[in-house]
Amino acid sequence: MMMDILMYLFETYVHSDADLQVDQDQLEDELLRAGFHQKDIYKALHWLEELAALQQTDAQTAIAKSAPTSMRIYAPEEIERLDLESRGFLLFLEHINVLTPETREMVIDRVMGLETDEFELDDLKWIILMVLFNVPGNENAYTVMEELLYSKEQGILH
């Protein structure tokens, strides 16, 4: 599954501070040896390329100019993918300044870019972490999100 590959890559190369300059062919071979399917590997790598490309788009400029009181209205397909709990979590993260409108839109874009029928709040948290890691200047937000993710996994968050 694509989400499993993304989490594997994030934990292996990003969270462990491993060498991020990995040859794509070597990476594909490693993922195949780890038991992932070629089709899913290509989808995951394409998803990551699209995440990197989001930083170069002009769409973020329009979002940055929106009024602070603006409210995000979700499209029907977004509502189908992001349940009420997930949408509430995104709103919560905006209120505590972990997400900006720009990073929220990047998260939603990448959530919609996943080819999966099953999507849960924990998956959303991983996507948020990946987006924050990939956008320069979000180190504090990344740290807060990482604490939210890992403290929940360890049963500390109340």
Curated annotation (Swiss-Prot):
InterPro entries found in the cross-reference section: Smg
Domain of life: Bacteria
Pfam name, any one: DUF494
UniProt family annotation: Belongs to the Smg family.
Protein name as catalogued: Protein Smg homolog
Originating species: Vibrio cholerae serotype O1 (strain ATCC 39315 / El Tor Inaba N16961)
Top-level taxonomy: Bacteria, Pseudomonadati, Pseudomonadota, Gammaproteobacteria, Vibrionales
Gene name tied to this protein: smg
